[in-house]
């Protein structure tokens, strides 16, 4: 038990390798994390079961841990969430209706994401806003001049700032000198906060958390003073104080239901969640393309076929519907997430339930590690292309004259955004953001690989690999940078 607990908390990569080995004999592996029984599950039927709404399994335990340890929610706030068993849907779960006047907390938050982030028209608006901001940054690169660039540095500054402004407006950066170094440090330590270790054991992450949340508090307070809820921008899809309508509605919901400190913690976690996934995935996707010039050219041809030019302004862009439907681009996107997103989807057993012949008792936890399914050779391997390696064409069906994108037979082994009622609400925007980013770069630039380098700039003797310290918690950034030379063509 001590070995399992210690390895689970300090070496998730090694622990998941042990689980994968054990799951060759059984789809369910039990271990103890301290006093808690945890069942690691795989297999199509089991994944379907934990992602299907059920009175026997609840996804809320993970979010309560995030609220407690990453947001920094107060005990009284956590009690209110625990007591709200009315569910996330429009109508309360029968038998769990709340008294009149009591807010349905899970439903309220879910409604904000569903209405203002997931809805097609609003996701498209945010994507367009992001693309315009990102394009404005790209045109600042010298035209027809070769320049050396570090890809990780580029994405962590230019892409991240465009995405942040699209979602949250410009004020976070304007109000907080040193915002980006602090944000990326918070992204690095957020998984450590999840374990809930006492401050005296590891004070560094708590200090970073407090400093980053203070930055977010400045943004919230400044926006509250500057924004007029009765003015002409009351229903605007974007304005400079809060940024997007989604951010404004989310902060409004939080200020009505949470303390100012917890509201700042929620905003900090939202910022981390958006940037710490889409930015490293875009970085990885371009790294894979640059490392394979033939694949780079093939993806560029697809993106050029979806490009457009405004007849009035001459501004170039893309037909989103056409771009997002390009088969090879979609295959590269899926392959990138398959290899570089590692999360443990977590559920709590609330009533006795049987999976694969095992009786799981209330209070137990179920975890489905996405990495195990996404590296399953039986599902993903192809002749000459093992599941452990990147192959951009892996998700194409080639029987027809034109390649077709397909995920047939793979969906239960691919869940980088989680699943069920707690699936990541930002997945639509994230996908469109990543695809637009790659399309903009491969069509606008000639890019050539120079070297793989360490973060300090020293040449590396190998390509980048997943940063193993973040496995199991997030989109995994590369542990090396890629130095390239590029030239902007237009």
Language-model features: where?
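Cytochrome P450
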Residues: 33-37, 125, 142-163, 177-178, ...
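Cytochrome P450 catalytic core segment centered on helix I
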Residues: 184-255
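Conserved cytochrome P450 K-helix E-x-x-R motif and the immediately C-terminal K′/meander segment
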Residues: 8-17, 310-357, 370-377, 404-405
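Conserved cytochrome P450 K-helix/beta-meander segment immediately N-terminal to the heme-binding cysteine loop
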Residues: 368-404
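Central I-helix of cytochrome P450 enzymes
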Residues: 247-302, 367, 426, 434
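N-terminal membrane-proximal hinge/A-helix region immediately C-terminal to the signal-anchor transmembrane segment
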Residues: 1-94, 413
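Cytochrome P450 heme-binding "Cys pocket" and the immediately downstream C-terminal segment
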Residues: 295, 410, 421, 427-471
């Amino acid at each position: 038990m001590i070995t399992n607990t210690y390895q689970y908390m300090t070496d998730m990569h090694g622990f998941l390798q042990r689980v994968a080995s054990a799951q060759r004999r059984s789809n369910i592996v039990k271990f103890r994390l301290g006093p808690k029984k945890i069942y690691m599950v795989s297999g199509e039927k089991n994944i379907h079961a934990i992602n299907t709404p059920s009175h026997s399994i609840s996804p809320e335990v993970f979010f309560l841990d995030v609220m407690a340890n990453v947001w920094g929610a107060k005990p009284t706030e956590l009690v209110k969430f625990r007591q709200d068993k009315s569910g996330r849907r429009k109508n309360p779960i029968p038998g769990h209706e709340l008294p009149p006047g009591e807010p349905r907390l899970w439903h309220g938050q879910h409604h904000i994401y569903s209405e203002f982030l997931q809805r097609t028209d609003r996701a498209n608006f945010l994507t367009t806003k992001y693309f315009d901001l990102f394009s404005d940054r790209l045109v600042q690169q010298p035209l027809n001049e070769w320049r050396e660039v570090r890809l990780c540095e580029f994405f962590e500054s230019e892409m991240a700032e465009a995405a942040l402004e699209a979602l949250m407006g410009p004020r976070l950066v304007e109000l907080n000198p040193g915002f980006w170094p602090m944000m990326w440090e918070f992204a690095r330590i957020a998984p450590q906060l999840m374990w809930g270790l006492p401050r005296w054991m590891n004070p560094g992450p708590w200090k970073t958390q407090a400093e980053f949340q203070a930055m977010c508090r400045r943004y919230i307070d400044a926006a509250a003073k500057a924004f007029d809820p009765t003015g002409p921008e009351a229903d605007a899809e974007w304005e400079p104080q809060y940024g997007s309508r989604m951010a404004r509605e989310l902060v409004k919901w939080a200020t009505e239901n949470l303390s100012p400190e917890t509201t700042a913690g929620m905003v900090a976690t939202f910022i981390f969640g958006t940037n710490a996934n889409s930015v490293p995935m875009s970085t990885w996707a371009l790294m894979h393309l640059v490392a394979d010039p033939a694949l780079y050219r093939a993806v560029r041809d697809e993106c050029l076929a979806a490009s457009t030019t405004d007849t009035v302004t001459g501004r170039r862009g893309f037909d989103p519907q056409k771009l997002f439907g390009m088969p090879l681009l979609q295959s590269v996107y899926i392959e990138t997430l398959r290899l570089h997103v590692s999360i443990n989807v977590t559920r709590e057993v609330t009533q006795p339930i049987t999976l694969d012949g095992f009786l799981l008792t209330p209070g137990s936890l179920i975890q489905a590690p996405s990495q195990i399914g996404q590296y399953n050779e039986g599902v993903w391997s192809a002749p000459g292309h093992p599941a452990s390696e990147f192959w951009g064409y892996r998700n194409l069906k080639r029987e027809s004259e034109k390649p077709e994108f397909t995920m047939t037979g793979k969906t239960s082994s691919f869940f980088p955004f989680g699943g069920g009622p707690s699936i990541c609400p930002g997945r639509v925007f994230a996908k469109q953001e990543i695809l637009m980013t790659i399309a903009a770069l491969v069509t606008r630039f000639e890019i050539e690989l120079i070297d793989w380098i360490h973060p300090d700039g020293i040449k590396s003797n190998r390509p980048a690999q997943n940063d193993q310290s973040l496995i199991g918690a997030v989109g995994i950034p590369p542990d090396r940078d890629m130095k390239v030379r590029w030239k902007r063509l237009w």
